[in-house]
Amino acid sequence: MGALHKAHLELIRIARQHAGKHGEVAVSIFVNPLQFEPGSDYEQYPRPEKTDEEFCRNAGVNLLFRPAGEELYFKDRSTYVEEGSLSKVLEGKSRPGHFRGVCTVVAKLFNIVVPDTAVFGEKDFQQLAIVRRMVRDLNFKIDIIAVPTVREEDGLACSSRNQYLIADERKQATILRKALLKGANMAGTGETSAARLTSAVRETIGQAPLARIDYVELVDAQTLQPIEVVRQNSLVAVAVFFGKTRLIDNILLS
């Protein structure tokens, strides 16, 4: 959606690897109104168009596709793409309609650009899983490549929304990574109770006075359904507010 940063640079780098010497890399930028719920930050979401364009040029992008809203959506639109299982939990529960917007715009972008490969970051793990399911179910002939979460030096996952954080919020937001690592360490030393693990993650996040937890969940990484026992390929996912800024992060317990 723009406001590009070093995590996007990593996506571009991986895309270039898969494109090879004779392939081309396309980047789409579109602040999608369908994936913002009422009262959210759609109007405030950063749109540094010139900076993003220069970013793509310096990164060696061959095509920057930046459509206007009226080019993608008719005023009387009545057709949407909606995944019916993975999108009902985690972010889907907290942000109803969000993934209908994501699937609709991604399907449209796939139809317009017709890529062989598309690259998505694991920070938005649920989005990645839903896009993969959509590609499978709708027979898109596109390979979906997952890229590990890119982080700042202090562990905070890179996000365009990080720039909303004031100094104290930014400092305390590093607790998310610490809490997730706490959960991973517990699993690694034999903890099997999802309740105890998520409780420890919550307690760690609670050490940051400005943190307000939306959810802390242990889920199966394939189905995204909550589980009661820690097992291979479990995922700890968190969503936490710092002031008005909502951040998400996760860690795979492999």
Stretches found by the model and what they are:
Residues 203-246:
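Acidic/histidine-rich
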